[in-house]
């Protein structure tokens, strides 16, 4: 796996490419951040499961992608992934300014002082943070 400075953008691109190609699963390099994002995607029902394989530098997170419909009518559950905050331009929001994605259908993944969580959880806890990405 290639080395990248933005592991989140790399993860989102791999998921986007895998869903467009209708792959069953996708592997991304394992970091604390990719594990946390995988956990949130699973909790919110965007992926059916995630697991970690390998050890050390070879460790990777494998996400099992979800689709609705069968055959030619097969549509991915994840319609879009958008990186918001990036290494060159960080985006921070307080709990009142957190984005609502498609009126609550999608989620924003936020990095807070209490860990990685969805915009709904952060709003409920009354905390803001770095808006990592949008998933819908």
Curated annotation (Swiss-Prot):
PROSITE patterns: RIBOSOMAL_S8. It holds the Pfam family Ribosomal_S8. GO terms for biological process: translation. GO terms for molecular function: rRNA binding; structural constituent of ribosome. Keywords: Ribonucleoprotein, Ribosomal protein, RNA-binding, rRNA-binding. It comes from the Bacteria. One of the primary rRNA binding proteins, it binds directly to 16S rRNA central domain where it helps coordinate assembly of the platform of the 30S subunit. Part of the 30S ribosomal subunit. Contacts proteins S5 and S12. NCBIfam families: PRK00136.1. This is Small ribosomal subunit protein uS8. It comes from Synechococcus sp. (strain JA-2-3B'a(2-13)) (Cyanobacteria bacterium Yellowstone B-Prime).
